[in-house]
Amino acid sequence: LLKQFYLANTSSKKVYLNPVINGTDIQFEIKEGMCPIKSGWNNRGNMTCPCCGSITTVNQVKLQFKAKTSKEVLLAIISETNRGKLYRSPTKNEYIKPQSKNIDKPTDRMAVENNRNFNTPGWGIEIYGDMFSDRQLFMLQSFTKNFSLLKNKIEPTQYTQALYTYLAIWIDRIAVVNTSLGRWHNSGEKIE
């Protein structure tokens, strides 16, 4: 569902995903400089197949998401360094998804009656847990588990209570932007 290929698109830094297409197999490599591909494969939800050029309408794409036939693909690893963001291709080990038995997927249903401001039901997302990939849920649950362990090991004081509150707000902010619906803001090099 790529609308464009830039990971970083600032005046001083240009990094992009370069698709390498071999038949119906699509891999990505990370390159620096101007991206030669002017637009992505997603135009207002309508998808253009990069292999054959045929178009899948937004309604057909939504039906695929509702039928749970779509899948996620890890495209890049982004690391923070003292000189800014570093972009690289995932290693084979990083492609491995967390075991679903280690993930407690939320099963609460969303209020789908009035979805004017939150249009996930049209894409087959009616349960809160469906908003997250297994990798995102594993990360969030690891944070909260370790946060709870930390809370049990340190004697409560006003300072630690303030620290716990800060960490809880931080985890909440991470959860808001780290969903499958999140977008990468390439000119700010951050998640939106």
Placement of each model-derived feature along the sequence:
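Nucleic-acid modification enzymes, centered on SAM-dependent nucleic-acid methyltransferases
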Residues: 1-192
